[in-house]
Amino acid sequence: YKKDAKKEGFVYIQEKISLDDTITASQLYTLAGKMGARLLSSHLDAILNQNLLPEPQDEEETVYCQLLSKIDALLNSQTMTAQQAEQQIRAYEIFPKTKIEISGFLCIINEANVVDAKATPLDIEFKDSKYLRIKKLTALSGKQMNADSFINGYLK
C-alpha cells in the first residue's frame, strides 16, 4: 500500500535502519525510538530556527503497512515457507502474536528457527520442505515455556 504524502506530512531528517535476520518487532521499536530521540534532540534547534526545512516524502520510497488482525497471526504450513513463518514470528511478536495449532492446542509461538530436518515433535514442516523448530511458546494456560516443557506437559 502506498502512503499519501499529503496526509503523512513532511520529513525534516531521516536515517536508514539496517535490519538483520534476527531483529524482533520490539527491538525495532526500541531502535527506532532511540534514533528518533537522537535525531530530534540534535536537530531541534535547526528546525525551530528554520535552518532545517521540511521536505515532502518521496512517493517512490514510502510504503504503508496495512493494519494487522488476529486472523493474520495464524501460520499456514501449506502456503508459507519456513523462513516466512520465522519472519512472521519476529514481526508479530507484539501484536497480533503468531499462532499455530499443535496437536489440537492453539499456541502462540514466541521463538523459532528454520532447520532442514525434523528432530522434535515441535518441528513443523512447511511448503518448502524445511521445518520451523519451535523453541519457546505460550500455551492456552498463558504461560510461556520452552519446547521441552511443552512436549512433556502437553504431548506426552
Model-derived segments and spans:
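Acyl-group handling in specialized metabolite and lipid biosynthesis
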Residues: 67-80
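Short secondary-structure boundary/capping segments
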Residues: 2-4, 65-67, 99, 123-124
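An anion-binding loop in the catalytic cleft
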Residues: 78-156
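Donor/substrate-binding cores of folate-linked one-carbon enzymes
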Residues: 1-64
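Generic anion/oxyanion-binding catalytic loop in active/binding sites
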Residues: 17, 29, 73-74, 139
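Short, conserved beta-strand edge motifs with alternating hydrophobic and charged residues
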Residues: 14, 56, 76, 99-101
